[in-house]
């Protein structure tokens, strides 16, 4: 064999410039050096602890994996393909080896699979080889009649052509021996046997290293005449590393557990009893674990979690924070608070921050953090959006990530590049707020994600107003990787309640509160009594909130009140508004009902809304009316009433005693409510409604009795209730089973019953191929259709709605600019579920696509608008879609109805 063959092998080319290439040996070394630097300088201590490898072994193994990951490019098939447009390189290779005239099964040997097959053939451990095979984001799969290591023999023409087996085998052996020596291993026998969790994290690190080393801005290509030289190193690596300038892991400024003094320094106020209890528990925990905080609404759970996160990070070397919330709106709402906190974490070191959800780039607060195009210079202290972490796949790799809980749930979903998500969470503190908002489908993914976080020894904080005892037990069992947890332990009805793990044991603490109980009087009423109830309650002034379970009902009630009570301002708030309109309504509500609102701002204001009012909006009503819903959510809604004690002296006399009216139907339950929550929970909640709620004392008993986990049920059962329970349980089971089809395996389970653990076959039948598909996969329900709403005028022009962007026209004969695209993308709205039902969805999408092809074909060429559906309204802000008439109103949001009904009713 000519010793020059190794120097002639190609790894990278430039599709636009046939005069550039990168030799395989250089890309291998670039990736090896980058991976070693990532392992030693970028990984946090917590992530290294999750890997469970001594630093010296980790350094050697990281280098080796980076060096060998593309050994599968050293096959005749790959070299034949890549040199088709590199005549000089091809000519050099042709003097060393023979290219077959054709390949019968070229798709049978992708180069990642070839890498794994070659490493197995040369005696590498299966786990190590499977990492190389998975470096494109998905582990290799064994065929029905062929194992991966047999791929060489089965498709030998792809590997070494005809008659040159010895040549290529000798080359592979030479490459492997060189990489072993450079890494510091004497032979393949020195390579470790790894576990599945270790392999996942190392694969994530390898993917990251490969992407960085493949970026020509960091590691440029060479002229085709240049074979490269060892003299390029170490400068080539130092220059590339400086160009990317990854932020260093978070190192909290408080190196000791946070006390009350440092808490006050951080947040500007001393800790209350609940916050102090969290600080105490965090300080005494001897190992990373799970901490569940159940406490009343408005008690400051966010600050308690951030303080505990600092303590955990300081104790166990976590390099960042993930803070998950139920919706994009709640994530946007808390982003400013968490950014301000993150700024306090930086002294001399810059950190990266990421708002992680589908519409993050449209959040102006987030966009203000975007750095300039150049990021070579030494950054100033603070937090910014590091360019490398802007991709969807890299979302969880930033130091501080604020996003929807979906981002965490996707760590349990079979999805390409899943390993990057695991790498992102393994070195962080994880906080999930409003954990009660997860439905049974999402719970399945959450529990599996928790099992992996427990395996990685990630500190986790879960926040909720309250949890059913069974759910609390399931969360702990998932984190500990246990099948069950002592049932008696979770019958604790103390409140506020802390539950945490200490190794494999579980402890609890009830927080003693010095402040008095807050009493809320409850009464029931029919919907038709609403105007009279409000007239009486607001006779002396004040504000009221009405929370119902469906958008249609909210719109109907708002219409009724505007007609019957014209002297009051009625504000409608739900999810079917354009993003800018909803954001403006949120701003107005926070201004008029927030902590700093004045009596004048609050007076004679009635807000009608859906569940979005119960989620993280820090507003305070003087009087509350709510439609019947499950007890835990009912209490969450009650938490929006008399929330801020600072308003108490100014409330009208008849509203100084908190009072909540629960709307019930005359006969059975409202159909919309049954569709959302199920009949069994509504029935139990109605049966258990007291005449008054004492907060926070009554919260745990009401919730536990409603969910009926304990053996002694407080409600006598009837034949009707038993049937409702069976239907509820069947629905829950069905949701969990549907979710379970696409779950990754638990940490300790292998894909094969015997042999060393390896990633092979680990992600068969992955559910999602795109980010949007992944987000949909971890949420239950019918598929939803999101549209961008614009207006098509009689003169043929397409414009923003008059109150958006000044009603400006947008050209349709060219792709919109980036700024135009961003403004158009903000006009987003989710169509009501009716339009995504099985019998309607194809027709709806077909109509929208045809309309877009006719009028907006050029818009699909704009990257931000590619694949988007645009709903064009006429100058009356209406449109006809799939036999329905849609109308958009700035105050009411989107309404719809069958065309014949709309004509009859004058809509």
What are these regions (language model features)?
Residues 2-253:
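Accessory nucleic-acid engagement/destabilization modules that flank
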Residues 128, 472, 528-597, 621, ...:
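C-terminal helicase lobe and adjacent C-terminal extensions/tails of nucleic-acid helicase motors
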Residues 257-294:
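Conserved pre-motif I regulatory segment
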Residues 287-309, 438, 464:
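Walker A/P-loop
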Residues 319-343, 355-361, 467-471, 551:
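Conserved Walker A/P-loop ATP-binding site and its immediately adjacent core
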Residues 338-399, 405-409:
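A substrate-engagement module of RecA-like helicase motors
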Residues 420-429, 436-508:
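Post-DEXD/H (motif II) to motif III coupling segment of the RecA-like Helicase ATP-binding lobe
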Residues 483-554:
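Conserved interdomain linker/interface between the two RecA-like ATPase lobes of SF2 helicase motors
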């Amino acid at each position: 064999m000519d010793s020059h063959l190794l120097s002639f092998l190609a790894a990278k080319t430039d599709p636009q410039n046939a005069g550039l290439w990168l030799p395989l040996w250089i890309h291998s070394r670039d990736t090896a050096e980058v991976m070693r630097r990532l392992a030693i300088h970028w990984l946090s201590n917590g992530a290294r602890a999750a890997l469970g490898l001594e630093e010296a072994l980790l350094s050697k193994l990281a280098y080796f994996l980076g060096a060998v990951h593309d050994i599968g490019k050293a096959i005749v098939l790959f070299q034949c393909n890549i040199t088709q447009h590199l005549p000089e390189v091809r000519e050099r290779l042709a003097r060393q080896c023979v290219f077959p005239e054709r390949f019968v099964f070229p798709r049978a040997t992708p180069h990642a699979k070839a890498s794994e097959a070659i490493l197995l053939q040369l005696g590498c451990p299966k786990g190590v080889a499977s990492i190389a095979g998975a470096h494109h984001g998905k582990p290799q799969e064994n065929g029905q009649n062929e194992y991966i290591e047999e791929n060489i023999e089965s498709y030998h023409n792809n590997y070494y052509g005809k008659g040159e087996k010895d040549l290529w085998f000798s080359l592979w052996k030479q490459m492997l021996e060189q990489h072993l020596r450079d890494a510091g291993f004497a032979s393949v026998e020195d390579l470790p046997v790894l576990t599945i969790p270790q392999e996942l994290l190392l694969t994530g690190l390898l993917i990251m290293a490969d992407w960085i080393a493949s970026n020509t801005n960091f590691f440029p290509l060479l002229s085709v005449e240049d074979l490269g030289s060892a003299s390029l190193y170490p400068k080539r690596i130092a220059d590339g590393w400086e160009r990317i300038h990854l932020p260093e892991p978070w190192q909290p400024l408080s190196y000791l557990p946070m006390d009350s003094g440092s808490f006050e320094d951080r947040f500007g106020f001393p800790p209350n009893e609940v916050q102090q209890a969290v600080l105490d528990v965090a300080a005494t925990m001897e190992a990373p674990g799970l901490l569940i905080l159940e406490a009343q609404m408005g008690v400051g759970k966010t600050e308690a979690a951030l303080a505990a996160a600092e303590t955990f990070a300081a104790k166990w070397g976590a390099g960042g924070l993930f803070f998950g919330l139920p919706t994009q709106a709640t994530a946007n709402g808390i982003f400013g608070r968490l950014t301000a906190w993150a700024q306090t974490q930086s002294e001399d070191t810059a950190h990266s921050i990421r708002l992680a959800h589908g519409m993050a780039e449209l959040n102006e607060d987030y966009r203000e953090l975007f750095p300039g195009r150049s990021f070579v210079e030494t950054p100033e202290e603070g937090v910014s959006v590091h360019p490398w972490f802007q991709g969807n796949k890299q979302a969880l790799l930033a130091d501080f990530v604020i996003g929807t809980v979906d981002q965490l749930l996707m760590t349990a979903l079979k999805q390409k590049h899943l390993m990057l998500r695991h790498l992102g969470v393994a070195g962080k503190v994880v906080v999930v707020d409003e954990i009660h908002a997860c439905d049974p489908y999402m719970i399945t993914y959450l529990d599996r994600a928790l099992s992996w976080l427990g395996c990685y020894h990630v500190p986790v904080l879960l926040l909720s107003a309250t949890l059913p005892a069974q759910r609390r037990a399931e969360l702990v069992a998932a984190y500990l990787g246990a099948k069950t947890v002592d049932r008696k332990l979770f019958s604790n009805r103390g409140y506020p309640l802390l539950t945490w793990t200490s190794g494999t044991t579980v402890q609890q603490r009830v927080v003693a509160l010095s402040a008095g109980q807050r009493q809320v009087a409850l009464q029931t009423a029919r919907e038709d009594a609403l105007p009279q109830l409000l007239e009486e309650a607001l006779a002396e002034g004040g504000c009221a909130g009405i929370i119902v379970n469906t958008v249609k009902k909210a719109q109907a009630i708002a219409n009724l009140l505007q007609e019957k009570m014209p002297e009051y301002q009625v504000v409608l708030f739900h999810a079917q508004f354009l993003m800018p309109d909803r954001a403006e309504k949120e701003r107005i509500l926070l201004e008029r009902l927030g902590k700093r609102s004045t009596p004048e701002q609050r007076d004679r204001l009635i807000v009608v809304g859906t569940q979005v009012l119960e989620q993280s909006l820090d507003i305070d009503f003087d009087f509350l009316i709510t439609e019947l819903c499950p007890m835990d959510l009912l209490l969450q809604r009650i938490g929006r009433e008399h929330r801020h004690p600072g308003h108490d002296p100014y409330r009208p006399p008849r509203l100084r005693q908190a009072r909540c009216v629960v709307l019930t139907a005359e006969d059975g339950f409202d159909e919309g409510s049954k569709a959302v929550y199920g009949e069994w929970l509504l029935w139990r909640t109605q049966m258990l409604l007291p005449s008054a709620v004492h907060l926070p004392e009554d919260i745990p008993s009401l919730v536990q009795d409603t969910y009926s986990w304990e053996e002694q049920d407080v409600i006598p059962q009837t034949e009707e209730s038993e049937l409702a329970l069976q239907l509820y349980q069947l629905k829950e089971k069905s949701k969990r089973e549907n979710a379970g089809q696409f779950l990754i395996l638990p940490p300790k389970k292998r894909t094969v019953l015997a042999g060393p653990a390896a990633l092979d076959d680990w992600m068969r039948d992955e559910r999602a191929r795109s980010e949007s598909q992944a987000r949909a996969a971890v949420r239950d329900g019918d598929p939803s259709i999101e549209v961008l709403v614009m207006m098509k005028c009689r003169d043929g022009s397409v414009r923003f709605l008059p109150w958006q962007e000044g009603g400006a026209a947008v050209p349709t004969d060219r792709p919109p600019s980036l700024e135009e695209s961003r403004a158009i993308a903000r006009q987003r709205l989710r169509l009501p579920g009716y339009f995504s039902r099985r019998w309607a969805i194809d027709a709806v999408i077909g109509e929208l696509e045809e309309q877009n092809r006719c009028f907006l074909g050029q818009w699909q060429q704009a990257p931000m608008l590619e694949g988007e559906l645009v709903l064009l309204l006429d100058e009356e802000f209406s449109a006809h879609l799939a036999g329905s008439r849609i109308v958009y109103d700035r105050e009411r949001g989107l309404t719809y109805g069958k065309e014949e009904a709309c004509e009859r009713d004058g809509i």
